[in-house]
């Protein structure tokens, strides 16, 4: 049976190795350490493992290896740049183990320039997915238009933004709007 110091040492090594490879949240690191302990430290007492995991997580937070707020901020910026809607960004944060309240608080803080951010995300999305003015058909029939609207709605964009984005006539106009929003948006 491994002693407490050895348990903590192995968990610390695993945490540092994992954090050296991936940006992580506290919740995700906790999952990784529990999974590791279940596989590699099966003879240890569950209470010792739990205490060691909490100590390792506290050490990682103290030294700045994991910082949930920094993780959230970087994911919000990356999501905006990638053309994700606020709903998609929220879902990604929840999947990463961030609690809903913390995610909403951070999104509210980043909401300055929100309309422009959603517009920019929608413009990037239609460019990447070849929808609207970037699509094959410049004036799609009503059925194709409905399909494009559905794709944007599934991506988490609101109906008002969808209609305005799909009403853009030319690629040049879309690119000009994207450039304007990029320069005016606080990321």
Q: Which residue stretches match the model-derived regions?
A:
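An alpha-helical, amphipathic repeat domain used for nucleic-acid recognition
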Residues: 1-187
